[in-house]
Amino acid sequence: MKKIFAIAALSLPLFSHFPAFAGASDELKVKLTEISSLKANFNQTVTDINDKVIQTGEGVFALSHPNQFYWHLTAPDESLIVADGTDVWIYNPFAEEVSVMDLNQAINASPIALLVHSDDETWSQYNVSQKENCFDISPKDKDSGGSEVQVCFNDNQLTKMVLKDQQGNISDFTLTNQSVIAGKDQDLFKFVVPDDVDIDDQRLKSTN
């Protein structure tokens, strides 16, 4: 079950029956850019293809432009995802394992990384549609294996994210207690590899 949270967070664009317009993509990018940084608590509910709740959780989410985000699941089991601007680190304390990949790899695997990425070429690979205060993001290449995500706003405040994965599971994330990143919170985007953990380095680039 722990993998559900890690995959959901990382895969963190839903699926709508409304047509995609270029204007929706542009408007979403503007909204995300206006959120230069964000820290919030989240509550997560995961339902399966039969709409049965299979897990709940809570934790802390943060983002900062460009290319930095932080996802710390604190209950029921701990896991951590940190994008430091170049690499994405996925830490499972229970398994004592860290996986690391390039940011671009993470975007290809999971469009949630688009929340802090403004590259036009990357965005051009996704359809974006809008219904009221929510935006649905899905890969244009249906064979890419990418997930679909919905993000919702209250005015310019990001309040909700919904993920549908390839197995039909839906993860609903509600954000509360939003604040701007300040002071020591900048350290959230710096991942220090713990001692005595296995490192699965999946980066395509040459490592230092």
Curated annotation (Swiss-Prot):
Chaperone as UniProt keyword: yes
Biological process annotations from GO: lipoprotein localization to outer membrane; lipoprotein transport
Keywords from the named record: Chaperone, Periplasm, Protein transport, Signal, Transport
Pfam families recorded: LolA
Family annotation (Gene3D superfamilies): Lipoprotein localisation LolA/LolB/LppX (2.50.20.10)
Signal peptide (residue range): 1-22
Cellular location(s): Periplasm
Major localization listed first in the record, in broad terms: periplasm
PANTHER family found in the cross-reference section: OUTER-MEMBRANE LIPOPROTEIN CARRIER PROTEIN
Subunit organization: Monomer.
Function: Participates in the translocation of lipoproteins from the inner membrane to the outer membrane. Only forms a complex with a lipoprotein if the residue after the N-terminal Cys is not an aspartate (The Asp acts as a targeting signal to indicate that the lipoprotein should stay in the inner membrane).
Family as reported in the entry's similarity comment: Belongs to the LolA family.
Protein name per its UniProtKB record: Outer-membrane lipoprotein carrier protein
Organism: Shewanella halifaxensis (strain HAW-EB4)
